[in-house]
Amino acid sequence: EAGEECDCGAPENPCCDAATCKLRPGAQCAEGLCCDQCRFKGAGKICRRARGDNPDDRCTGQSADCPRNRFY
């Protein structure tokens, strides 16, 4: 929703403050295939294995989202 940085949920979420729906201090992300322990996974980390002859999808290091490669 508008103004939220992360989905409010359980209070014990280490990345997201359930009261404010904002990322906790030092957190870059709260969820996503390219988010690991509240931080973006490094550029080039595989986030989705390829099917067929297409290459694997890899994290950019700048987002928690796993971008689809251009070959699909």
Swiss-Prot record:
Cysteine pairings via disulfide bonds: 6-21, 8-16, 15-38, 29-35, 34-59, 47-66
Domain of life: Eukaryota
Record's GO cellular component terms: extracellular region; plasma membrane
Domain Disintegrin: 1-72
PROSITE patterns: DISINTEGRIN_1, DISINTEGRIN_2
Localization (cell): Secreted
Record bears the keyword Secreted: yes
GO molecular function per UniProt: toxin activity
Region (Disordered), start-end ranges: 52-72
Keywords: Cell adhesion impairing toxin, Disulfide bond, Hemostasis impairing toxin, Platelet aggregation inhibiting toxin, Secreted, Toxin
Organ and tissue specificity: Expressed by the venom gland.
Motif segment (Cell attachment site): 51-53
Keyword presence, Disulfide bond: yes
Classification via Pfam families: Disintegrin
InterPro entries according to UniProt: Disintegrin_CS, Disintegrin_dom, Disintegrin_dom_sf
Other facts: The name colombistatin has been given to this protein due to its source species B.colombiensis, which is a synonym of B.atrox. The disintegrin belongs to the medium disintegrin subfamily.
Assembly: Monomer.
Family classification: Belongs to the venom metalloproteinase (M12B) family. P-II subfamily. P-IIa sub-subfamily.
Role of this protein: Inhibits fibrinogen interaction with platelets. Acts by binding to the glycoprotein IIb-IIIa receptor (ITGA2B/ITGB3) on the platelet surface and inhibits aggregation induced by ADP, thrombin, platelet-activating factor and collagen. Also inhibits T24 and SK-Mel-28 cell adhesion to fibronectin with IC(50) of 4.4 uM and 33 nM, respectively.
Name assigned to this protein: Disintegrin batroxostatin
Organism: Bothrops atrox
Taxonomic lineage: Eukaryota, Metazoa, Chordata, Craniata, Vertebrata
